[in-house]
């Protein structure tokens, strides 16, 4: 769970202390590098789909940071590179806009086609 990572815990502390104001939008990007695609494709039939496999942590953070539950979700995705995802009714790139019960918003982008590893 990402909420136990020091940087996310610090952001939550700042939210709770009122240091950064009211949270109206939480934006998240979860991307798998193309260099790990072999193992990702092997796991894909058992993963439950990109949102369940990758975005469960993003959804948790959006709920945690906004202090609210999800009211509505609009999602779109596509297969742009790896045809196996078509067979699984999944996507290799997907995005979702989330409306929270308290009016806050969330935006998630996820993909399995990142050209290089992200610097941390």
Per-region residue spans from a language model:
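NAD(P)-dinucleotide binding in Rossmann-like oxidoreductases
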Residues: 79, 84-91, 98-120
């Amino acid at each position: 769970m990402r909420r136990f990572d020091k940087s996310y815990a610090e952001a939550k502390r700042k939210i709770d202390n009122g240091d950064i104001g009211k949270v109206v939008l939480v934006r998240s990007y979860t991307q798998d590098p193309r260099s790990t695609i072999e193992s990702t494709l092997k796991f894909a039939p058992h993963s439950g789909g990109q949102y369940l496999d990758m975005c469960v942590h993003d959804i948790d953070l959006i709920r945690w940071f906004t202090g609210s539950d999800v009211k509505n979700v609009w999602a779109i995705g596509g297969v742009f590179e790896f045809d196996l995802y078509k067979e699984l009714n999944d996507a290799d790139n997907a995005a979702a806009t989330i409306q929270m019960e308290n009016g806050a918003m969330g935006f998630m982008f996820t993909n399995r086609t990142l050209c290089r590893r992200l610097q941390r």
